[in-house]
C-alpha cells in the first residue's frame, strides 16, 4: 500500500512538472509540435525550423522553411524554398505558404503565392504539415494548368508539354521569359 502511494505521488509530481514546462503554448503551437514530431519526410524534402512552436512569445508566429528538390518531372534537379507561416488559429486555418524563389510554374505567381487547393477551399483541420508537404511535392510532379496563378505558364503547358519543359529548363537556370527574369533554382 505504501509503495502504491509513493508511485501515485511520483506520478503527480511528474504531471505537475510536465504541465509547468509549457503552460503558455497555444493549441496551435501544440498541434504544430505534434505535426513536427510525426513528420515523415521523403528524401526530396528538407525542413528547417525558423521560429520554433516551443516559443511562448506570441508576437512571433511559428515559421518553417521547406526545401523541395523534385527528383522527377519538369522541375527535376531544382531546389525550391518555401516559407510556412503558422498563425495562432492553426489548424482551423492553414498556414500561409510562400515560395521564396521566382519560378515559372502555373500554380505559383511571381510574388511567390501558391495555388494549392488544400491551402484554400479544401483545407480541413484534419490536414496537417505532412499533407501540406505532400501537396507541395505534388505541385512539381503534376502542375495544374486549370487553376493557375501564372497564366502564361499555364497557357504554355496547355499548348504543348515540350515547349513548357523547355521554358522550365530555361527559367530554372536563371533565364528570362517575356521580360521576366527567374531565379536560378538548379541544385548544385
From Swiss-Prot:
InterPro entries for this protein: Ub_conjugating_enzyme, UBQ-conjugat_E2_core, UBQ-conjugating_AS, UBQ-conjugating_enzyme/RWD
Keywords for this protein: Acetylation, ATP-binding, Nucleotide-binding, Transferase, Ubl conjugation pathway
Record has Nucleus as a keyword: no
EC number: 2.3.2.34
Catalytic reaction list: [E1 NEDD8-activating enzyme]-S-[NEDD8 protein]-yl-L-cysteine + [E2 NEDD8-conjugating enzyme]-L-cysteine = [E1 NEDD8-activating enzyme]-L-cysteine + [E2 NEDD8-conjugating enzyme]-S-[NEDD8-protein]-yl-L-cysteine
GO terms of molecular function: ATP binding; NEDD8 conjugating enzyme activity; NEDD8 transferase activity
CDD domains, per database record: UBCc_UBE2F_UBE2M
SMART domains attached to this UniProt entry: UBCc
GO biological process, one term: protein neddylation
Top-level lineage group: Eukaryota
Domain UBC core: 27-177
Post-translational modification: The acetylation of Met-1 is cotranslational, and not regulatory. The N-acetylmethionine increases affinity for DCUN1D1 by about 2 orders of magnitude and is crucial for NEDD8 transfer to cullins.
Residues that span the membrane, as ranges: none
Bias-annotated ranges (Basic residues): 1-12
PROSITE patterns per record: UBC_1 (PS00183), UBC_2 (PS50127)
Gene Ontology CC terms, in alphabetical order: cytosol; nucleus
Alphabetical list of Gene3D superfamilies matching this protein: Ubiquitin Conjugating Enzyme
Class of the enzyme per the UniProt entry, highest EC level: transferase
Stretches for region Disordered: 1-23
Keyword Manganese applies: no
N-acetylmethionine modifications at: 1
Catalytic residue positions: 115
Family per similarity comment: Belongs to the ubiquitin-conjugating enzyme family. UBC12 subfamily.
Protein role: Accepts the ubiquitin-like protein NEDD8/RUB1 from the UBA3-ULA1 E1 complex and catalyzes its covalent attachment to other proteins. The major substrate is CDC53/Cullin.
Subunit (UniProt): Interacts with DCN1.
Full protein name: NEDD8-conjugating enzyme UBC12
Source species: Saccharomyces cerevisiae (strain ATCC 204508 / S288c)
Originating gene: UBC12
Amino acid at each position: 500500500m505504501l509503495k502504491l502511494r509513493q508511485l501515485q505521488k511520483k506520478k503527480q509530481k511528474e504531471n505537475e512538472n510536465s504541465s509547468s514546462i509549457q503552460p503558455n503554448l497555444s493549441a496551435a503551437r501544440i498541434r504544430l509540435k505534434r505535426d513536427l514530431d510525426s513528420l515523415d519526410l521523403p528524401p526530396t524534402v528538407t525542413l528547417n525550423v525558423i521560429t520554433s512552436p516551443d516559443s511562448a512569445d506570441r508576437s512571433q508566429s511559428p515559421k518553417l522553411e521547406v526545401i523541395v528538390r523534385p527528383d522527377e518531372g519538369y522541375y527535376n534537379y531544382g531546389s525550391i524554398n518555401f516559407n510556412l507561416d503558422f498563425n495562432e488559429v492553426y489548424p482551423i486555418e492553414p498556414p500561409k505558404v510562400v515560395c521564396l524563389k521566382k519560378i515559372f510554374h502555373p500554380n505559383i505567381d511571381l510574388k511567390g503565392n501558391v495555388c494549392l487547393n488544400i491551402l484554400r477551399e479544401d483545407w480541413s483541420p484534419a490536414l496537417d504539415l505532412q499533407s501540406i508537404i505532400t501537396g507541395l511535392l505534388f505541385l512539381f510532379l503534376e502542375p495544374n494548368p486549370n487553376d493557375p496563378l501564372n497564366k502564361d505558364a499555364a497557357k504554355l503547358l496547355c499548348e504543348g508539354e515540350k515547349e513548357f519543359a523547355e521554358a522550365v529548363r530555361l527559367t530554372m537556370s536563371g533565364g528570362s521569359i517575356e521580360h521576366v527574369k527567374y531565379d536560378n533554382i538548379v541544385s548544385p
